[in-house]
Regions:
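Short amphipathic, basic-aromatic surface patches that mediate peripheral association
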Residues: 2-23
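Compact integral membrane and secretory-pathway proteins
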Residues: 3-6, 73, 124
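Short linear motifs at secondary-structure transitions and domain/linker junctions
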Residues: 4-7, 52-57, 107-110
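Beta-strand-rich binding-surface signature
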Residues: 7-9, 27-29, 75-77
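Short beta-strand segments enriched in hydrophobic/aromatic residues
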Residues: 14, 34, 82-84
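C2 and C2-like phospholipid-binding beta-sandwich domains
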Residues: 18-29, 47-50, 61-67, 79-138
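Tryptophan-paired
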Residues: 33-74
């Protein structure tokens, strides 16, 4: 499908922590990537460490631009993971808790996903969170 590709911005607005992976406060971080057809553009929020003292039911205002540009192909792949930090993902003693992953490929037929995607429930056996993000035309 050949079409004019718009200039887009993917903005991670909020994360509602329904249940973190720990008893009491959690230490939250987010990782993922956006691929417009030219390769994965990774991100981490915060860039290092974690967001401390996050309690169940708390909403985090993230407001981070994950990607900007004109897609190089007819696909815009958005992948966002929520994590509760413990001793690292590969720890045998107390690994980080995966709270859920959002993964979707937007196409011109979906208007590139333009609009607000609010309170998307994501969960694993270790926790649950609600993702809100927006894709905007520049």
């Amino acid at each position: 499908m050949s079409t004019d590709r718009p200039n887009l911005t993917v903005l991670f607005e909020q994360a509602g922590i329904v249940h973190g992976g720990d008893i009491g406060a959690a230490e939250i971080y987010f990782e993922g990537w956006v691929d417009d057809g030219s390769g994965k553009k990774p991100f981490r929020i915060p860039k290092s460490g974690h967001i401390p003292e996050v309690h169940d039911g708390q909403t985090l205002d993230v407001n981070a631009v994950l990607w900007q540009g004109v897609p190089a192909s007819d696909q815009l792949h958005v992948h966002i993971e929520g994590w509760d930090e413990d001793l690292g993902r590969n720890s045998k003693i107390n690994p980080d808790d995966h709270l859920g992953t959002y993964d979707h490929v937007f196409t011109p037929g979906e208007r590139w996903g333009v609009g607000r995607h609010a309170s998307i429930p994501l969960a694993t056996k270790d926790g649950e969170w609600l993702l809100t993000f927006r894709i905007e035309k520049a």
